[in-house]
Amino acid sequence: MLHHRLVHSRRAALRMCALVIALLLGMVLTACGSGAEDPAGGSGGDAPGAAAEAPGSPGDAPQRIVSLSPSATEILYAVGAGDQVVAVDDQSDYPQGVPTTDLSGYTPNLEAILGYQPDLVVFSDDNGDLKSGLDRVGVPYLQLPAPGDIEGAYEQFAQVGVVTGHADEAHELVGEVREQISAAIDAAGGAGEGLTYFHELDPTLYTVTSASFIGQVYSLFGLQNIADAASGAGAYPQLQPEFVVSANPDLIFLADAQAGGESPASVAQRPGWAGVTAVRDGQVHALDADITSRWGPRIGDLAQRIAQILADRPGT
Amino acid sequence: MIAAAAAVTFAVLLTATLVGASGLSPSSVLAELADALPLVHIDSGLTTQQQAILWQIRLPRVVLGALVGATLAVAGAAYQGVFRNPLADPYLLGVSSGAGLGATVMIVAGAAGAGMGSLGVPVAAFAGGIVAVAATYLLGRSVGGGRGEVVIILAGVAVAAFANAAQTFVQQRYQDSLQSVYAWLLGRLSTDGWSDVTLVLPYVAVTIAVILLFRRTLDVMSVGDVEAASLGIRPARVRLLLVAVATLGTAAVVSVSGLIGFVGIVVPHAVRLVVGPGHRLLLPLSVLAGASFLVLADVVARTIMSPAELPIGVVTAAIGAPFFLVVLRRGTGMQ
């Protein structure tokens, strides 16, 4: 599981220590959780190659962090490291007032990143050989890839906390989000048990299966994903329209309902969709695309939103 | 010959209508289709929902596949005849790159809240395709100084490269639409019910009709421009007209289906290997074979990863290439 690469740097040993500490902390936190299983599974698989080190004292914590991932940005601010962030990428827009720049996480430009003189770079995907570039110039980094499950997200909160010198706040944050999610599950009161749903990523019917991070959140409520029939095509398959209609989901969630996007009305007008249970019962719901696509501290908000939808459903 | 091919195409379309991800039994689908015939009354036993799946989702998709395949194949055959170049295909003059640019701009604008509804992307793709080919033609004429087709083709290469660069640039700037753009570029027989079919039908009809009208003229022109001119044909005008209608049809079908490769080049060649190079048979058979080929490819796209989709552009290339090599081998053996 753990790919440990040889880091060519004077402080390689220290960094390995930091990695071990961060991982241990993740495990400890996970173990404190509600009977959690081994978090190392899931599609988020690899342990992040955290080349960043845990600060020896609060004064040593990185003070010029550059974040290239909207999820990472949200986590950084949520653990209280916001004051140490100098620049975030063009997709990061939450919380309000983050220092958004034209840096890109998809096509990272090493020179532009180094222009901010970062002492820590946080990113999710190693696009454009970013990692080896940062290695070459000796800038510490922390990679936070999309986790396979919620526990994986909690681990990342903890990691960010350790690396930025906010381990305690991160620990609290994990507790809060856990609390929020279990409260949401209680509020739903089993209303989702056995209901089927379809989570729409875009109008061409790209979706998620239960194996995805977001699919896991739905599973907490006992919801059944119609896309699981297509899990042979990965965690993010594109479903055929006739299958979605014949699977007849009880609920449809739209993650493509931003301005100019889809809406319950536009879904009802699709050929053959008018008779789908979710459309007939008015159970087509627009979700905030940012909240559904990021694995940050707002997972709890998503869980609450789902709970609200289930609780408001007639006949529950 | 043509009647037999038409029967095969009909059989392919019918078979494709029986196959799908929603588990309707083929016999009840057949009964439902027969029930729609005048004076026939059969109870298919399908629910209202299942009938909607058949009539509003599956059948339009099959019909759209037939229209797109027929148009790409006949446009490819026309291009090959006009440019006297066996490697010409309908995308030669930049229509696909232009359409890709138009579609990408509109998808991105839509994500940013342009809100032109579901018509926005096809209209933008269509316009982009037409503009790109017009630019190719005008550039080719202005720099070519009457040096004919080669310069036009090279101008097409330049225009396509430029449009691709612009398309990539736009795509990189707006990462959140990346998946939608990518999916469009790979091609998908859009399933907007009958609206896509009615949208492209006039263009498809005009394109096929005009190209078929000129099938004998193309045969004469293949002998040589001087001989054609002596029979009262004006080759330059015929070429311009045929390129214009082939482009129009291609831009129309690409605007609803995305970029589906390989059909415009493989199908005419496969037909040629069977019936020879004469346009009189080649063009109508390309229409029928193109329709069959793309509908079959879509059946594969719908079944191989069912209930997920496989992009049809992947299928046309994956089944088209080996099939083509087999035909080539048999064809060369026959001569």
Regions found by a protein language model. Name each.
Chain A
Residues 109-123, 139, 240-255:
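Proline-aspartate-enriched helix->loop->beta-strand connector
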Residues 129, 143-160, 192-217, 260-262:
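Extracytoplasmic ligand-binding site segments that recognize negatively charged/polar headgroups
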Residues 152-153, 157-162, 171, 251, ...:
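Structured C-terminal subdomain patch of bacterial secreted/periplasmic proteins
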Residues 64-126, 223-226:
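A short, structured surface patch at a secondary-structure boundary
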Residues 69, 125-126, 146, 201-203, ...:
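Short secondary-structure boundary segments
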Residues 73-78, 93-97, 205-209, 253-254, ...:
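Short, solvent-exposed loop/turn elements at domain surfaces
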